[in-house]
């Protein structure tokens, strides 16, 4: 069984140390960032190199939401406005969401990336932190669900697996979880009827990502990522039975060493630990504390990867033109 982890790497190509480490550690998958991106040809070489290092067709992930969170940028790739701006400006927001993500999927599949960390089902609230705000689809549950579904279906049509995030919801976070631990004191019934509702509606998606956030009504002592009660809630109350990965355990919302964070996440019940930085000390700590995937996690991974299919035919120039017609302010 592969190690229950998704790892980042340092640069545009693997170092000799990384090749040897990855061969031995055998993480389930990899994640790429702007530091790993230069050109389409370079990315194709890197994604092939990552898979060769572990000797299998390992998934390669990225955050390509469009807008601020976009690792592939011009001049080689298209630019997109923030998701919230598009939802507010488009003549047909849900169709625009599908077209946008079908174009993104085409760009990702072309360079060997087969998992995109989207859609976001967090609800926009009055106090939502600016780091998240314009990445969201809106404050209305049916709209967010429809936009999330359109995103996921478009990615799948383009040969890319979607990741539902951030379960069970960052919308009420008023601090940036990259820098501190958000805490929400809303009653359980409010959370169930609002924050958790979009995730329940999208619970059939193949992969999900946890939120580093404390809900006092769920577990006042631990963020969801390392809380057995929160993971139980995700599995049983929300009903998500897909492959469950953490958000980046390097974020400041979590405490302890990388080894302690990885171990606590696995102990809580997540399937996979995400470590993004690509630094040798962090990677070695994660590898020292992260076991092989469980039988249950392996089953979920097999079900998710079975949805990786060749892209459906698409007229890309026509889709580019359609998106410009749907969102004229962004053209």
Spans of model-derived segments:
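N-terminal beta-rich core of secreted/periplasmic extracellular enzymes
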Residues: 1-128, 137, 144, 153-154, ...
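Second-shell residues forming the walls of enzyme active-site clefts
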Residues: 35-53, 146-156, 160-297
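Short glycine/serine-rich loop/turn segments
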Residues: 115-139, 166-185
